[in-house]
Each structure stands twice: as structure tokens, then as C-alpha cells.
């Protein structure tokens, strides 16, 4: 029974780590060239929403449009928490592994896991 629990915990940890790695590579900013500067701001906002920012690049006369997506909170994991790696160590590991990562030890199925929250 304990072997099954350990295997299940290992697979769950791998799934969390994989999902968090996929979320890390998603961009939060979209920059697009909308050709000529004519009605630049209007076209930018129509295509990417009211919070988008437009800029006419003078020398080449092209309209640049940047849209920003709000930061999303994601959850990941690093390793098990132990006496040698308590909550402060877990928090440090999360900060190293994930951008703006913060972590803490959480009891799950009889194990103390280091769980991280980070913006993605």
C-alpha cells in the first residue's frame, strides 16, 4: 500500500511540475506590427482591447501595438520538505525555480511537499 502511495505522489509531483513548466513559457505581452500609422490607436484597441497601447514608429511609418494580459497565478512544486529543508528552504527553492515564486510546506497524503505559487 505504501509503495502505491509513493508512486501516486511521485506521479502527482511530476504532473504539477510539467504543468507549471508549460505555464511558464506563455507570454504575458503581445507586440504586433499593424502596418501603416493611419488610425493606429483605433485599430490597435479594436484588435487587442481597450488596455492595449499603440505607437506610431516615425521613420518607417508603422503602427506598433502592445497588449498586456493580466498575470495569472500558477502552482508548482519543487521537492519534499524535510528537517533539513523546512518552509524557509522551500520558499528559497521556489524563488529560484519560478519567476516571482513563493513557497511553503503542505501536508498531502502523509507527505510534506514544497508547493510554490508564482505568476505565469
UniProtKB/Swiss-Prot annotation:
<feature type="disulfide bond">
    <location>
        <begin position="85"/>
        <end position="105"/>
    </location>
</feature>
<feature type="disulfide bond">
    <location>
        <begin position="37"/>
        <end position="56"/>
    </location>
</feature>
<keyword id="KW-1015">Disulfide bond</keyword>
<dbReference type="GO" id="GO:0005576">
    <property type="term" value="C:extracellular region"/>
</dbReference>
<dbReference type="GO" id="GO:0050832">
    <property type="term" value="P:defense response to fungus"/>
</dbReference>
<dbReference type="InterPro" id="IPR039641">
    <property type="entry name" value="LCR"/>
</dbReference>
<keyword id="KW-0964">Secreted</keyword>
<feature type="disulfide bond">
    <location>
        <begin position="90"/>
        <end position="114"/>
    </location>
</feature>
<protein>
    <recommendedName>
        <fullName>Putative defensin-like protein 179</fullName>
    </recommendedName>
</protein>
<dbReference type="GO" id="GO:0031640">
    <property type="term" value="P:killing of cells of another organism"/>
</dbReference>
<feature type="signal peptide">
    <location>
        <begin position="1"/>
        <end position="27"/>
    </location>
</feature>
<keyword id="KW-0929">Antimicrobial</keyword>
<feature type="disulfide bond">
    <location>
        <begin position="44"/>
        <end position="65"/>
    </location>
</feature>
<comment type="similarity">
    <text>Belongs to the DEFL family.</text>
</comment>
<feature type="disulfide bond">
    <location>
        <begin position="40"/>
        <end position="63"/>
    </location>
</feature>
<keyword id="KW-0611">Plant defense</keyword>
<keyword id="KW-0295">Fungicide</keyword>
<keyword id="KW-0732">Signal</keyword>
<feature type="disulfide bond">
    <location>
        <begin position="74"/>
        <end position="120"/>
    </location>
</feature>
<feature type="disulfide bond">
    <location>
        <begin position="94"/>
        <end position="116"/>
    </location>
</feature>
Amino acid at each position: 500500500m505504501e509503495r502505491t502511495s509513493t508512486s501516486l505522489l511521485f506521479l502527482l509531483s511530476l504532473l504539477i511540475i510539467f504543468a507549471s513548466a508549460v505555464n511558464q513559457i506563455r507570454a504575458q505581452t503581445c507586440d504586433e506590427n499593424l502596418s501603416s500609422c493611419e488610425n493606429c490607436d483605433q485599430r490597435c484597441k479594436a484588435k487587442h482591447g481597450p488596455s492595449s497601447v499603440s505607437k506610431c514608429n516615425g521613420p518607417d511609418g508603422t503602427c506598433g501595438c502592445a497588449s498586456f494580459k493580466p498575470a495569472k497565478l500558477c502552482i508548482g512544486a519543487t521537492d519534499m520538505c524535510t528537517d533539513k529543508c523546512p518552509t524557509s528552504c522551500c520558499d528559497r527553492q521556489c524563488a529560484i525555480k519560478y519567476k516571482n515564486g513563493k513557497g511553503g510546506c503542505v501536508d498531502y497524503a502523509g507527505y510534506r511537499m514544497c508547493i510554490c505559487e508564482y505568476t505565469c
